[in-house]
Amino acid sequence: MAGSEPRSGTNSPPPPFSDWGRLEAAILSGWKTFWQSVSKERVARTTSREEVDEAASTLTRLPIDVQLYILSFLSPHDLCQLGSTNHYWNETVRDPILWRYFLLRDLPSWSSVDWKSLPDLEILKKPISEVTDGAFFDYMAVYRMCCPYTRRASKSSRPMYGAVTSFLHSLIIQNEPRFAMFGPGLEELNTSLVLSLMSSEELCPTAGLPQRQIDGIGSGVNFQLNNQHKFNILILYSTTRKERDRAREEHTSAVNKMFSRHNEGDDQQGSRYSVIPQIQKVCEVVDGFIYVANAEAHKRHEWQDEFSHIMAMTDPAFGSSGRPLLVLSCISQGDVKRMPCFYLAHELHLNLLNHPWLVQDTEAETLTGFLNGIEWILEEVESKRAR
């Protein structure tokens, strides 16, 4: 099922509407609602005389709506710093509408989201009146949970013993981690992610060891991250190269021969497909999965089928439970408009999975984002082995 892909081609004309386009319009509408809200009368905050005296300044004497308008020009980091100065600003900077604005503004630009940080879409769809009157959601807490910079900071504060344990454990691990890579992004993009990987000097690709060969699949490709962390990828295509090329030229979807479809009477949530025996052998030996999604904004998706394919591949019946899933939210080149990774995560129903996952923005041409994703999945495998 292995093959090669063309590196470049002509972009197909985008259809008039896309899944992401509709949500993008809703988010832009949310921004406008925010700016309208700050100009309307809102319930005034009550503060003691002592607090007013403590925070007495030109800014605090302004109407609260004007204060919030000014605060909206600060970065979230600066806003948190301001909140640490005194009790008045600590209360003021927590305004739910202000943080809802930041969340709607910044969420589409974040390059990764994981199983711990995916925000509930319901909190983004809440009418502005409910946010103002009820404030049921702590939007500041949601923002900090989702923000990649916050996640990175908490990751760097990991206890030292965890790193030492992982290092000692790695000394007795003989085989490098092995991953199964599959998904429409391997086949539909005008630039081949696989060819970019195979020509990467940074990853040092070499043929896998013959003794680890799987009949009909091969032994995969060995890579090396930062000249020390070795890993192996088994690249799985849905069908033959000839059929993939024809589907790309005709702008259709090739029949995916990795899976067999269940009868309608046997259909269960997320299990409309099962892997064929040949692929099942792959699922039994890998340490994790890499799903390459087509994240180009004009692309129409069969989200339920994609979710079912992921569920079939990661079925714990064919291997240990809790194996990590890396989703590469992939586009051909940097100038192609992409759908945000949080939207792709929701549409793939990744919140229904019972194992760690990460969605990482990636460019096939430059491999931007790929190394970040690989670092994450290698850390997850190390952590799982050390437990």
Swiss-Prot record:
Result for mutant: residue 12 to L: In esophagus cancer sample; impairs homodimerization and reduces ubiquitin ligase activity
Outcome reported for the amino acid change (mutating residue 23 to Q): In esophagus cancer samples
Outcome of mutating residue 8 to R: In esophagus cancer samples
InterPro entries per record: F-box-like_dom_sf, F-box_dom, FBXO4, P-loop_NTPase
Xref: PROSITE patterns: FBOX
One Gene Ontology term, aspect cellular component: SCF ubiquitin ligase complex
Effect annotated for changing residue 13 to A: Reduces homodimerization
Superkingdom to which the source organism belongs: Eukaryota
Pathway in which this enzyme or protein is active: Protein modification; protein ubiquitination
Domain F-box: 56-102
Reported impact of residue 341 to W: Abolishes interaction with TERF1
Pfam families recorded: F-box-like
Post-translational note: Phosphorylation at Ser-12 varies during the cell cycle. It is low in resting cells and high in the S phase and the G2/M phase of the cell cycle. Phosphorylation is decreased during late G1 phase. Phosphorylation at Ser-12 promotes homodimerization and is necessary for optimal ubiquitin ligase activity towards CCND1.
Major localization class: cytoplasm
The keyword Kinase is annotated on this UniProt entry: no
Key words of the record: Cytoplasm, Phosphoprotein, Ubl conjugation pathway
Subcellular location: Cytoplasm
Gene Ontology biological process: cellular homeostasis; cellular response to ionizing radiation; cellular senescence; common myeloid progenitor cell proliferation; negative regulation of fibroblast proliferation; negative regulation of protein localization to nucleus; positive regulation of protein polyubiquitination; positive regulation of protein ubiquitination
GO molecular function term, any single one: protein homodimerization activity
Effect of residue 23 to A: Abolishes homodimerization
Function: Substrate recognition component of a SCF (SKP1-CUL1-F-box protein) E3 ubiquitin-protein ligase complex that mediates the ubiquitination and subsequent proteasomal degradation of target proteins. Promotes ubiquitination of cyclin-D1 (CCND1) and its subsequent proteasomal degradation. However, it does not act as a major regulator of CCND1 stability during the G1/S transition. Recognizes TERF1 and promotes its ubiquitination together with UBE2D1. Promotes ubiquitination of FXR1 following phosphorylation of FXR1 by GSK3B, leading to FXR1 degradation by the proteasome.
Subunit structure: Homodimer. Part of the SCF (SKP1-CUL1-F-box) E3 ubiquitin-protein ligase complex SCF(FBXO4) formed of CUL1, SKP1, RBX1 and FBXO4. Interacts with TERF1; this interaction is prevented in the presence of GNL3L. Identified in a complex with CRYAB and CCND1.
Descriptive protein name: F-box only protein 4
